[in-house]
């Protein structure tokens, strides 16, 4: 049971990989709710879709590796440029000439690529809890190797390919508990773990190894090429990506920063009313500018 069923849906195939998309609502502008890390599919936007579709045309699609999209093998299939190209393919398949892109976490990487390389296609960019290496990470996240076997399974040592293959659910429960630091997050935690179990640990390892756009100067240069209006929303209690990374992105890209007091890494799930109103206000401001 969903609060809002899609008005249209389909697949677009690019280089042998099929990507599933859904469309909701009508009117201009179009808002594309982008895939995040393929640990989650597009259902993580379920609290945004019904509200935004009452005001705009909304597109979502499952990122490669999850949902109803294909799961190609190998890290080369999960680079930022592959996700960016999928975004453009979905826009083309749905006759979407221009759109406002909304990204969560590492979705910021491919949304920024699209905005920088194809400015004529992007009217605006909203980044929620951006996972960008423009400021230092939380210290506890850089203690352990992802690739090497570890002698501990405590804390962030679970963010390790060998642990994922051994106790995938254990990793998911830990990771999403850190994403959802707000009290009373049981439903959101259950949703996220359930969705993530639709992905195999082998696929998730490939997605992690495919993220190449993490070099500081390289991403700074990309940000400097973005010309559209940008909104950055970041919680000050984000245990995955520190608030300083969102602040640094807003500065580097010339965007507006909104800080959500007490929010963790998934504010669109835990405080959807506030996030939805921010997104609507941002999109409507772009529509007014276009008149």
Regions found by a protein language model. Name each.
Residues 112, 116, 123-162:
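Flexible "cap/lid" loop of the alpha/beta hydrolase fold
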Residues 46, 60-106, 277:
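Active-site loop/oxyanion-hole signature of alpha/beta-hydrolase fold enzymes
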Residues 254-291:
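Catalytic active-site module of serine/aspartate enzymes centered on a nucleophile-bearing elbow/loop
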Residues 17-72, 76:
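Conserved HGGG/HGGXW glycine-rich cap/lid loop of the alpha/beta-hydrolase fold
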Residues 226, 232-234, 238:
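Short beta-strand/loop motif that positions the catalytic acidic residue
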